[in-house]
A protein has these predicted regions:
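N-terminal acidic, glycine/proline-rich low-complexity segments
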Residues: 1-176
Length: 176
């Protein structure tokens, strides 16, 4: 029996429930705590493609519960941006790369726009984006705030078969 051993080859950032600068700092915090500062961070979109929603303090001013910790010994982000990194990694790991989104889909939508074959080279794309509004059943929060991006990913994803998965945790009955 073969064991699934995922390898994290990068993180990308985008404006979402907090601004992109906070997302970048929060990724740094998480990687430092996890002792995984070997994982590169590729900075991405600072705004949505059409309408950038206002960020709220729902998860604190920093988007991660207002962790008032001095950040030291951080690894700088890669010079390469998120969109070009996603496209390049999809070519390097063609048929093997699984992308998991935890926020706005702007970088994914831009990767599709940059390279229409981007999604077809992925093994899978899991969209688990910002499920914070429990009253919105079966809709992703970022589907409401980044509707153009989610429509772009969904419409292209329909053509590539069983590689695209939306994880609708916003349905309160589906939570453990």
């Amino acid at each position: 029996m073969q064991c699934f051993r995922p390898k994290i080859i990068g993180l990308t950032t985008a404006n979402g429930n907090t601004n992109e600068n906070n997302v970048y700092r929060n990724n740094q915090r998480i990687l430092k705590v996890a002792k995984r500062q070997d994982v590169p961070i590729y900075r991405g979109s600072k705004s949505s493609l059409v309408t950038t929603p206002e960020t709220t303090d729902y998860f604190g001013r920093d988007g991660l519960g207002d962790v008032d910790e001095e950040l030291t010994d951080l690894v700088p982000a890669k010079d390469q941006g998120a969109v070009s990194a996603l496209v390049e990694l999809s070519k390097t790991y063609e048929g093997q790369l699984t992308v998991i989104t935890l926020g706005a889909l702007t970088n994914i939508a831009m990767a599709i726009k940059t390279d229409p074959n981007f999604l077809s080279r992925l093994s899978h794309l899991y969209v688990g984006a910002g499920h914070i509004h429990m009253f919105v059943t079966k809709l992703l929060r970022n589907g409401l705030t980044n509707s153009f991006e989610i429509l772009c990913v969904y419409s292209v994803g329909q053509r590539i078969g069983r590689k695209l998965f939306f994880i609708p945790l916003s349905d309160k009955d589906s939570l453990p």
